[in-house]
Amino acid sequence: MGRMKKIFFNQKSDLNSMKLFFCNRIMNKGEIRRIIAWFLFNHGTSRTAHMVDRLKILGFYHATKAGISLSIDDLSIPPTKKWLLEDAEQEIAKTQKNYSIGKITAVERFQKVIDTWHSTSETLKNEVVQYFEQTNPLNPVYMMAFSGARGNLSQVSQLVGMRGLMSDPQGQIIDLPIRSNFREGLTVTEYVISCYGARKGLVDTALRTADSGYLTRRLVDVAQDMIIRETDCGTKSGILLGPVKDEQKVVFSLQERLIGRVLAENIYSPKQKQYIAKKNQDISASLSDKICEIKRTNILVRSPLTCKSIRSVCQLCYGWSLAHGNLVDLGEAVGIIAAQSIGEPGTQLTMRTFHTGGVFTGNIAKQIRSSIDGKIIYSLTNTIPMRTRHGEIALITQSNINICIQGKNKEFNIEVPINTILLVNNGSMVRAKQLIAEVSAPVNAQSVEIASKYVASDFSGEIHFENLLLQEKKSAYGHKMNRAGQYGGLLWILSGQVYKFSLDVPLMFDTADYIHNGSCMAEHNIISQYGGILQTSENNLTIDNSNSYLYVLNSSMTIINAYLSHIKNARSEAYILTDDLNQKFFMQVESNNVIKNNQIIAKFVTKTYLTNTGGILKYSSEIEVDEYDIVTQSYPVRKGGIIMWIPEETHLINKDASLLMVRDCEYVEAGTQIIKDLICHSSGLAQVSQTNDILREVVIKPGKIYRPIDFSQVLDKHQTLIQAGEEICDGIIAEELVYLENVNLSSGSALLIRPVVQFLIPNSTELKKLEAQYQLKQNISIQPSIHICYKDGQRIHAWQSMEIAKIFLRLEIDSHLHKLNVTLNLIENKLLQIKMFEYLMIDLNQIIDFQSYQNVTRLVRKFNNYIIPGTILAKTEIIAKDHGEVRQSNKNFEEQKSFLIMNEHDQMTLFVKNAYEFFQLGDLVHKGKEIVPGILAPQSGQVIQLQANRVTLRLARPYLVSSEAVLYVDDGDFVKSGDTLVMLIFEQSKTGDIVQGLPRIEELLEARRTKGLKPLPNNLHDLLQSFFDEATEKYGIQKAAKKSFEKLQLFLVNEVQSVYKAQGVHISDKHIEVIVRQMTSKVMIEEGGDTTLLPGELIELHRIENMNRNVSVHAKYKPIVLGITKASLNTESFISAASFQETTRVLTKAAIEGKTDWLRGLKENVIIGRLIPAGTGFNVHDKMYSRDLSLSNSYNLAYSSNSQHKRIEQKNAEYNFEDIIFD
């Protein structure tokens, strides 16, 4: 924690020669990290662990002595904060003024406000640090944050500086910053804004942590079988390494990238005239520096991407194990290490992004400030004027220019690069520390996105365009829209109170009329269309209510030959209508319900159409029915007749056939047991239906069995009806209507003569009608109607009684009155009453806008009076709350008519001598502009009246509209406060953080084709195909797959790295290379040639290359990239694939194909409980693996010999010996 420590280290690991050196540095977190790394490299892990342990004890000892803790007095706020905030507020007030007079657009104002607060926040952050250093370097807050023990600069600045700008839940920056810090305490508004970001942080952290964890799981699954299995695969190829750059800035130097790699070429030094490094030599930090002195870029190194080992990586292609800075050991599970290295920062980043709770951190342009007071001089030759993003006019340099600031005693010279924005005019006076220029970074097309901002009206009034030309364009959806022209212009709102009426309200005034407060502006009549008796609701009509009703009784009927009774029990209640013949009707609607034309209101209770069992229904030829009615679940009868019912008893069983107690086609008596606990209710022929030993149903068909002398004579009588008196066969005459059916019995074929029951279906007109007494008109009636429940020929599967026809009572309304409402009054022990009303709602909200008017509604007719159609019942007068001159819009709107009232509140009078010299009618005046010598305009407005010594302005507000903006209003329109005027289109830099980072990583590693149902441009599949097409032309089809894979692999590695680098996270390339190797190892067969492969099959590239060497007609194939999920499911091991996803599918497929799992990976061995083939278990597996490989000669690959293994083991033994420590 202290400022300075004397630390002594022995340079060699030899314990006897204790050569010490003095390390005179401030020991903060970074320095301790460097020391530990150096110690680890020079002294091994055991000694380092011991040293770190002693460092810990030393740290705790001094921490205990110091007793550092945080008290509220330690949070000292820099005094400069007050004037920094005052400066920012002055700058923003100036910006707001410019916006209100139409000098800058809403977007420019917003960006200026954001940038002002951001730079204030940054400046204050630096002031905080300086203040601590100058006043109290031993301040606990300062020591904790800057030693790296706890907290960071951002958190300290929020404690004692200002919290700064925050984002809202949509990620947009709120232009109201949090000026306070936590020491001073937040205001209520600031606290609420602050909570936005904190809540968003918590939710996002939870979601991203899950995403990151799942990413790690998929990566582990895809790479778990990547193990270092041999020393050298013998490859001659490698990849070219150079520094990683973001625009001009080096993000990842070549020195760093080379450390831990193995060279694939010899490096020759022309100065020393000798090789300083040889092929297959691993690169240490010192060697990396030497190589970079000779070659700046394109150094050929070995890589897991080009390793020839099958389903593994060799030691030399992998390079160092980053854990201990030596060549990786045999049996190291590098796949799992790679997966964790890529997946883990996802979680970490997720946490890190949101620690500050959504504080906005944008990238600020490099600023150039004057170091002295003086006069600024520069050449204007290589500059052109431009509008900055803050709407200010500035100069931008087209080449490097020199700026000179001439002070009283000295000069200050600075050379600024191309694309520098000069914010101060040539020859102006500048103060020390004043911002004079900003160096703008070259804009990358990918870092810019098109954004939009809506501008709403600040007050109501009339739209007026100044120098604003419109172009009519079509949107992406084909809608027409107005776009501002190339140069934009000004959109003015001329003040006035805007009123809107519905179209059918007649206005009582005209344009240019003067309206007085309390005068009638419009009158709305409430008219009865149908006539009748005017009534009110039960609660008396309150006319001043905005939603009141008037009722006009159009007609009323009362049933006189029937009365209502109310039945109620524990389960339900119902109304029964009983007529003078004691026929009962079950009411289907409740009291006071509104009913429609043709609606069923009651059902006739009768047993006339009940059957004993199920059966077959047949219509006679006279019957005609309408289409099926869903409400009544029946067919309305248009014309009556007879329906025939052939009874049969059906039992649906669905049980095992062995339970059946009767035989198929056996005649059974009523009461016979069919299966246990199930008896038949009718006598007849039993027919059994079963499938696959499951008993489906048993049908009992009543009737008599007759065996004809000659069965062929009755074949054509199967399923026919025989009328009474007709011959059945062999001279037998039918006594009544019967149904014939041929049946096959065990003793031979026979005829089943089945009984038929007939039901009479009358016409609806023949049914008895209820008698009614009418009041007013006969516009409504109750009509009986009969419905058949089943269609002709339908078989009804049932054993209990069924209803085959129903009689209903339905309401009929005259066709011209269908819009009217009909209600039923059900009164117990009284008559049924039906009334038809015309409801007239006084909905004043539809007619007018209440904020602007008063209204008075008067009844012009008395209640209970009869009125004829078209009579006015009430009048609503709309009374003006304001006074003033009326202006009407020339435009016809589809829904509303609008007008505007302008009074003295919308005007301002200026006393000016000789007004005619300076003004003309219609002139537009900007606030703050000199209108006559010595007089500035106090408000913006339009000249509407001129007299010799006075000018009347109509107050107005200008809005600057940029080019290509989309306008939602037109010249002359009336708008209210808050209406959207225009959508400004602008470019903004994309803000990068892990919220975009993790999905991008997933998009790359899963090789996504689409995003949000839209195809992804430049997705990996399209890129690979284009690389393959190029390579085929250049190298031929045999080499094309390999070459296109190499290109895609490098692209993928760089893309993944760029996402992590943007977050400041360091991941070694080799980890990403291991994963990418797994994604790009397979090809898809297009033509099998002489191989046994089928088109569409996926196979590893090295296998198909070996196969093609041994056949005359080569197989054709194309490279494919598999996402990590697909690669996991397409792995050689089905046990591993099944444990990942789609277990049943993977195992079923493996079983059908008779697959063998060779248990090469870690996962499959863990699952079946064997020793894993990594670490200590490697040698056991390696012997078996080598034996497996020696059996398959087709692969043609040389594996490492035992002598190489011994050499490596000896080398490792040496390292381990070095690591022993004697305390």
UniProtKB/Swiss-Prot annotation:
Residue stretches spanning the membrane: none
GO cellular component, one term: mitochondrion
Pfam families registered for this protein in UniProt: RNA_pol_Rpb1_4, RNA_pol_Rpb1_5
Reactions catalysed: RNA(n) + a ribonucleoside 5'-triphosphate = RNA(n+1) + diphosphate
GO BP terms, alphabetized: DNA-templated transcription
InterPro entries from the UniProt entry: DNA-dir_RpoC2_beta_pp, DNA-dir_RpoC_beta_prime, RNA_pol_Rpb1_3_sf, RNA_pol_Rpb1_4, RNA_pol_Rpb1_5, Rpb1_funnel_sf
Gene3D superfamilies: 1.10.132.30, 1.10.150.390, 1.10.1790.20, RNA polymerase Rpb1, domain 3
UniProt keyword annotations, A-Z: Chloroplast, DNA-directed RNA polymerase, Metal-binding, Nucleotidyltransferase, Plastid, Transcription, Transferase, Zinc
Co-factor remark: Binds 1 Zn(2+) ion per subunit.
Positions that bind Zn(2+): C233, C307, C314, C317
Enzyme Commission number(s): 2.7.7.6
Superkingdom, taxonomy of origin: Eukaryota
Annotated GO MF terms: DNA binding; DNA-directed RNA polymerase activity; zinc ion binding
Cofactors (names): Zn(2+)
Enzyme class: transferase
Function (record text): DNA-dependent RNA polymerase catalyzes the transcription of DNA into RNA using the four ribonucleoside triphosphates as substrates.
Alphabetical list of PANTHER family matching this protein: DNA-DIRECTED RNA POLYMERASE, DNA-DIRECTED RNA POLYMERASE SUBUNIT BETA
Family classification: Belongs to the RNA polymerase beta' chain family. RpoC2 subfamily.
Oligomeric form and interacting partners: In plastids the minimal PEP RNA polymerase catalytic core is composed of four subunits: alpha, beta, beta', and beta''. When a (nuclear-encoded) sigma factor is associated with the core the holoenzyme is formed, which can initiate transcription.
Alphabetical list of HAMAP family matching this protein: RNApol_bact_RpoC2 (MF_01324)
Protein name: DNA-directed RNA polymerase subunit beta''
